[in-house]
Swiss-Prot record:
PANTHER family: REDUCED GROWTH PHENOTYPE 1 RGP1, YEAST -RELATED
Annotated GO biological process: negative regulation of protein catabolic process; positive regulation of GTPase activity; retrograde transport, endosome to Golgi
Localization, UniProt: Cytoplasm, Cytosol; Membrane
Transmembrane segments: none
Pfam family, one: Rgp1
Organism of origin: Mus musculus
Domain of life: Eukaryota
InterPro entries, per the entry: Rgp1
Record's subunit section: Forms a complex with RIC1; the interaction enhances RAB6A GTPase activity. Interacts with RIC1. Interacts with RAB6A; the interaction is direct with a preference for RAB6A-GDP. Interacts with RAB33B.
Protein name, UniProt field: RAB6A-GEF complex partner protein 2
Family: Belongs to the RGP1 family.
GO cellular-component term (any): membrane
Recorded GO MF terms: guanyl-nucleotide exchange factor activity; small GTPase binding
Amino acid sequence: MIEVVAELSRGPVFLAGEALECVVTVTNPLPPTATSASSEALAWASAQIHCQFHASESRVALPPPDSSQPDVQPDSQTVFLPHRGERGQCILSTPPKILFCDLRLDPGESKSYSYSEVLPTEGPPSFRGQSVKYVYKLTIGCQRVNSPITLLRVPLRVLVLTGLQDVHFPQDEAVAPSSPFLEEDDSGKKDSWLAELAGERLMAATSCRSLHLYNISDGRGKVGTFGIFKSVYRLGEDVVGTLNLGEGTVACLQFSVSLQTEERVQPEYQRRRGTGVAPSVSHVTHARHQESCLHTTRTSFSLPIPLCSTPGFCTAIVSLKWRLHFEFVTSREPGLVLLPPLEQPEPATWTGPEQVPVDTFSWDLPIKVLPTSPTLVSYAAPGPSTSSITI
């Protein structure tokens, strides 16, 4: 029996363009009750990163597969296919790297191997929606002699920051070590430089604050004014807004605001049913605030953006956008007053009206959500960093 353990050194969350580092440990455990044990051998082990794409058949109409592409023996158990047995299709993969060949371990012996690969920047982010799913995995394949291949899959989460794929790593003294006697690995230097560049771009895009005011009106007049200080956010930030109802001419009885994502299938991939079109848009609510606001002149709200959510993106098949969805309940009666008089000549009982004629309307405000530091996401929303399998 051989135990294979794969451990991600920095957690399972990465930014596209970063280098993934994984330590693969192969052990021939010594049974505590065994009186004798024999050595174990593996013919080889290889590792590869791939992105698996799956679409809902009821929502997405995909074109037929290209028959001109060669088939690499998908049914053979001796061919290393990292996506073997998974639903959907592999849309992105890195070149496979061999970890070792002809490994023999004595009882109780263990050996470790380091795997490093740069995550492609041309792929989509990790996403699990109602119409499509993009799932990244690191797959390690091991094989004994004259035996089928055994696959160990390590789930990954990949965040994509648009524009980094067009940036080239500088090869001048600007990124050279400060001391000529200190050597730094090129891959580590490039990885840290890319992380710093991504952090600078995210900070520049989300730190700009400027008050934006929006007049909210229905068909009968002004309801209020909504104010927000910025429209670009990072994962983990709070969306803060204010609502001024004191200037309105239409009484607002209640309002709610929801932080939502809108997943939309591109028109050319929408599933058509007879003469109609299948649902191509789905909404997910991540946070919500509701308030009864009669006689309220000014109020505010704060909606957190979950770290486990996906920033906005767009591919040839689907797009994901963020928005604030408002719903207002207003009174049809002009000058509605539901407070008791200040002076009562004699004792009286005051009750609110049993029925109030109302109107409802909604309003959507688009916002932009960008990724954040992968290290922050790993700490705040931890996922499994270690996977193991027994051969």
